[in-house]
Amino acid sequence: MKKILFLAHHRIGRSPGQRYRFEQFFDFLETNGIQCYLANIINENDEKNLYHSKNILKKLKVGINSFFRRWKHLKDIESFDLVVVYREVIPTKSTLFENYISKKNIPMVFDFDDAIWVKDVSDVNKKISFLKDEKKIEKIIPLCKHITCGNDYLANYASKFNSNITIIPSTVDTDLYKPIEKHNKDGQVKIGWVGSHTTVKHFEMITGVYLKLKSKYKDKIDFVLIGDETYHHKKLGIKGLKWENKIEVELFNSFDIGIMPLPDNEWAKGKCGMKGLLYMSVAIPSVMSNIGMNKDIIEHGKNGFLPVGEKQWIEVLSKLIENKELRKKIGDSGRKTVLEKYSKNKIKKTYLDLYTSLMK
C-alpha cells in the first residue's frame, strides 16, 4: 500500500479546517489502497496555553516542544510516498522543515484554505506575533510538487510561485450533516453563528444589527454563538457554547437561521465559505457577507442571502424571522447546492486521483 504523511498542527478530530480539507477522506483513501498518517504537534494542554493563556513563557514552551516533535515525525519520512503539508509544518517563521522535506525524493503537496499570507493575529497571541512570518508561504510554495487550495482567490496568489495547482473546495460530509426535524414549540427563531475565540470578532461586526432586531422582536428571537464558551453579551442574552464534535450536527440543526458576517478585506477574500456551507448542508438559510467565495456559493434570494450594509442585514433577517416558509424554501435550496457542488462524495475522487498521480 502507498503511504501519505499529513503534517498539521492539531490532533485528528480537533480542527474543523483539517477535517474538511483532508481528515474526512482518510477512510475513502484507505479503502483505495492508500494508508494515511496524521502527525500533529499541538496537544490538548498546548491548546489551553496557546489560545486561552496570556503567559508568554508557556506559549514559547509550546513552540519549542512542537519543534522537537516535528523532528521526530520526520525521522522516518523516507518510508512515505507523499507528504501533505496543511498551511505550514510549524507555526513560526522557520521553513527549515519544508526545506528538509523538499531535499528528499518524496513529492510534497501544500494545502491551504485561508489567505494565510495576510497578518491576522488574535488578541491573546499578539505578544508572540514576532515569531510568525506570514510571507513565508512565498518560500514554501516553490518547494512543493503540487498545491491544493480552496478557491480561485487563493489559487491566483499561489500561481505567482508555482504553476501546479488544483482548486479543491472545502466540503461537507452530507451523509453526516443533514436536516433533523425541529420541535420548536414556542416558535422562537434561533439565529446562530459558529466559529472560534479568534473569529468571534467577525460575529461582533454587526452587533448593531442584532441589537435592533432584539429590540424589534424581543423574545421571539434568540441568538446562539458556538465556538467560544467564554463569550457573553448581556443585552443579547448570549452565553457562548463550546463546539462539541459529538453533537455538532444537532447544534447546527438547532438554528433557524445561520449567519456569516465578514470584513471586506484581503483576508476575508481567502475564506472558503465553510460556515455557510455547514448551515446550508442542514437546510438552514444562510446569510453571509457579500465577499469572496460567498459570492460563488450563494445566489442572492435563491439559496441564501448576501446583504450589504446594516440596512440590508436587518431587512433580510427580518424577512426570515417573520416567514417560516421562506426559511424552509431557502434552506432546502441551500442543501441542494451543497449536495451538487460541495459534498464530500462529489470531491473524494479528486483527492484520490491527484494523490495517486503524484505517487507514481
Annotate the PLM regions.
Residues 67-78, 92-110, 116-118, 127-147:
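Membrane-proximal helix-turn-helix segments that form the acceptor-binding/catalytic region
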Residues 153, 171:
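Carbohydrate-associated surface elements
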Residues 90, 201, 245-281, 287-296:
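Nucleotide-sugar-dependent
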Residues 299-311, 319-325:
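Conserved acidic donor-binding segment of nucleotide-sugar-dependent glycosyltransferases
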Residues 12-28, 38-39, 173-176, 184-254:
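Conserved catalytic-core segment of nucleotide-activated headgroup transferases in glycan assembly
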Residues 10, 14, 19, 83-106, ...:
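An aromatic- and histidine-rich active-site surface loop
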Residues 326-341, 347-353:
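A short, well-ordered alpha-helix in the C-terminal region of glycosyltransferases
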Residues 42-57, 108-138, 173-175, 187:
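Acceptor-binding helix/loop patch of EC 2.4 sugar-transfer enzymes
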